[in-house]
Amino acid sequence: MSPDAILTALDPEQREVALALNGPVVVLAGAGTGKTRAITHRIAYGVRIGAYKPTSVLAVTFTARAAGEMRTRLRELGVQGVQARTFHAAALRQLGYFWPRVVGGAPPRLQEHKAQIIAEAARRLGLSVDRVAVRDLSSEVEWAKVSLVTADDYERAASATGREAPSGYDAQTVSRLITAYEDVKTEREVIDFEDVLLMLGDMLNSHKNVADEVRSQYRRFVVDEYQDVSPLQQFLLDQWLGGRKELCVVGDPSQTIYSFTGASPRHLLEFRRAYPEAQEIRLVRDYRSTPQVVNLANEVLKRAGRAGGAHQALELVAQRKPGPPAAFTAYDDDEAEAKGVATRAARLIQSGVKPSEIAVLYRTNAQSEAFEAAFADAGVGYLVRGGQRFFQRKEVRDAIVLLRGAARSADPELPMPDQVRDVLAAAGWADQAPAARGAARERWDAMQALVSLADDLAAAATPEDPATITGLVAELDERASAQHAPTVEGVTLASLHAAKGLEWDAVFLAGMSEGLMPISLAETDAAVHEERRLLYVGITRAREHLELSFGRARNPGGRASRKRTRFLDGLWPDEPRAPRARSVPKGRARALLTGVHDAALFDALREWRLEVARETDKPAYTVLTDATLAAIAEIRPSAIAELARVDGIGPAKIDRYGATILAIVASAPAEPSP
């Protein structure tokens, strides 16, 4: 792509970013404004006109997915050789390279999870800890390290920031635990992820020859999501720069949602104080979302007030055509909310929206269970973000081994995607997805993601750089090392924090009530302001369809004491709550049946469900719940239309089980009316 073509593809503000080739540059980019497009085109333009040497550019971001997307964009622009990595991936690579020369031998083993070491450190101190305490203490140790707070400084730092120690412990105990944690690591000769950044930063700071070599290699730096940088990451960035100013940072203070982990927007907000000569460029044209979504997002931030950063917020300007209005629904309880969301998602899928373009977002991971059950009842496939990592799945590892072998004997005359399909077919993949869900469908989904990636690479290929199985394997290896998995089909269930950086055609924001949004643990003004920003992030994930909801009660029949979130004051329309769903509390289905023959029908339905569960290797409740079976036994539907009105049966289950269920009902004699 020519330099002119690179610039032509940009809007005026994005073009300004691309032309700002020499730092320092700060780009304030709102959600959906094309920041990745702007910074990748900036790099590509610099390379194309000869201002940048590709291998001298280091672009760092916070997630493997974002780094992978940046590499893909650069490759599509015809740029090879630029290093786009997370902070940790870049640091780990450099530390591994220099360690043998500076220290000698191999670097210590990387301990990915702190739990075992934290538990041992606590045991040595005589502390009683359970799994939850270990998790909370691990998070506190991580906060201290990324904040550059030592064990000796912890009490003072915690007091100064108003940070409370994990429940059941005081600051002095946490300070002692940090010391014990470091001792256990030293004895076991392991390091954690924070050590990787600390050790490399110290190595660059104290060994001039190492610093000179790194700074000679990397002369230009780009940092994405700069509002989330921690003091530790800033320390390493300063060592990489070595006083130079060839730095471009991109961020949005309104998307700061990781303060609890040590991230701070201070570095972004004070960038021009550190670099008075810095050029500031603002991206506010939102290409992602409809005006309805953008306006709601803007209004949520405006209501934060000056103390909440409203004066610093970028006011987005929607570029898309108008879409449907945001929907607001108050359900009777959490179960009704989950069922309602699943039903609405199923309707979107029927209307043509892909399942992978739908997400249900909530404040805490504990909220996922109700939605998992509801989507299973509705026959809609789903993926819980944060589950087993894609590249850890056995079928994926086996498939990559087969592709690696096929690369050695690949026919250059055959299209690469066709060869990939042949290889995976031998491993059990088929053109059509299996009808059953469960393990078999998950296995197919994973292999289908590899097929889709092969198609994507072939579509981006050029005569000079054709798509090959060798190239596919190399791409998979790079993604595996960065945990950047290809997309698997299914509705996404995720926490709001896990959704950062992602987007979907349709987004359901669930649990929009006080106590969940903001979370009850947000007791300070700063914490509440961050919760508002978290809602803003959730809203701006939606391209077209946006629905916000909450349950007035936690359980069916419970007291409707919940109130909708304060963040939507003046925005949530006054409208009646959703129609009360006919629900059967779990464990009471049989008690609600009307007679002996209904009970017999209920038993027959349960026996059929057990057979289906065994055949499809899936939990029985995911076929149909007891509540749904009880409703069928009471209503005794005689036609598909009647069956479709039963709560818990969606279109997919009608297609799959409808005829069989009607046959079971018809074969069960009804008791005469008294």
Label the predicted regions:
Residues 647-650:
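Small-residue hinge/turn detector
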Residues 163, 167, 354, 368-380, ...:
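Conserved helicase C-terminal RecA-like lobe
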Residues 8-19, 23-31, 38, 58-59, ...:
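Conserved helicase NTPase motor core
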Residues 21, 100-194, 218, 280-282, ...:
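ATP-hydrolysis module of ASCE/P-loop NTPase motor domains
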Residues 591-638:
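C-terminal accessory/binding modules appended to enzymatic or scaffolding proteins
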Residues 1-104, 108-109, 212, 242, ...:
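P-loop NTPase Walker
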Residues 51-56, 76-82, 97-110, 121-132, ...:
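Short, polar/flexible loop-turn hinges at active-site or ligand-entry regions and domain interfaces
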Residues 27, 31-43, 276-279, 285-381, ...:
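Helicase P-loop NTPase motor core
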